[in-house]
Amino acid sequence: MKHGIAQDGLTSTTCIGLFLAAPSIPVPIVRAGLYLARSLGFFWLARRLTRRGLRIICYHGFAVAEEYKYRSTLFVRGEFFRKRVEYLKRKGYPILALQDALAALAVDRLPPCATVITMDDGWRGVYTVGLPIIRELNIPVTVYVTTYYVENRIPVYTVTVSYLFWRAAAQRVDLPRGIGAFDLRHEAEIAEEVVQKFGAELPPAERLEFLRELAKALDVSFDEIEGEQLFRVMDEQQLRGLAAAGIDIQLHSHRHNWPLYDQKMVESEIDENRRFLQRIVSRPLQHFCYPSGVYGPHQAEWLARLGVKSATTIDPGLNYIDTSPFALRRLVDGGPVSDIEFAAEMTGFMELVRSLRRWLSARRTQRAGAGMNSSGPGQPSLPCGKGGA
């Protein structure tokens, strides 16, 4: 179901003030503020101030057809990726292998504005669309691979279901297997949630058959999905080809299901993931990416015991010598990210903005605490935390 604010005459001070202080700003105003900041030299200054920070960029898959119209962060076009890498090279961002970058970061010997490119999940388009571009541009890339769907050759269920509902032409649907009838004009999210839960309990072969039934009910061609091999991860042969081409393949859990507090499940996910990939990859499997960015600081010890040396998040920001190797920040790139926003992240301007916003928030908290403490005798003393950059 394919179910900006213009402001004239804003001064530069007003634009930057809005940008730094407001919790939510319309995208056109943000971009206007970024263009203004660049023209005033703030991008250049930010790059100098943050040059010792490691930039790690996060991509996911490549569109093999028109999936980018559905989720343009999950599936980027090949030309989009090419232009990004060409920008990095043109602007002098050295692109390093993950292992080399982390080793240099640990001893504070990174080249200025060092950059790492990572890709999550192991989507088929990384091999069919991305690899030729990676080879042509001669860049190191790390691909974090989740292995359940490598082993079970069906489309990724959660993403396929979401796509089918996005494509649905019908306004009302009677879902298969007695799940229920829904008015998609008002209940699409509820219907999709029910279907996601239902399919999670099915074995792979039955899950595939249910996807066909669901597509028919929603009046979407499943033949197109199967014919173009949409929403599939790489198979073993493609992963071997990726590894043979020098791509760094690393850990991303087996089922892409990551608990916060179940240590045994964490161990199982890493062990199964590593055991499967060891049949394909000769280099050590010791770097990890948290599925969907779910993690807790307490998991660092768990991962270290499992022989993992680093773990990436989807928290925005740069990485310095004092950044935990188990909470590495990344810049998530994709179709919705404009050129000026990408430049703002890469130069470190947005890093400085986030630091300033944290500082302003801490100041407001301190003032509020001071106000309560000065409200009269007998009031309890409230602790105030300090904000850091």
Model-found features: residue ranges?
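Extended, charge-rich helix/loop segments that form flexible
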Residues: R47-L54, R153-A245
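CE4/NodB-like, metal-dependent polysaccharide N-deacetylase domain
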Residues: L110-P111, W123, P132-Y144, Q196-F222, ...
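Long, hydrophobic, well-ordered secondary-structure blocks that form the structural core
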Residues: M119, W123-T160
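A short acidic, amphipathic alpha-helical/loop segment
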Residues: V129-I133, Q238, Q299-W302
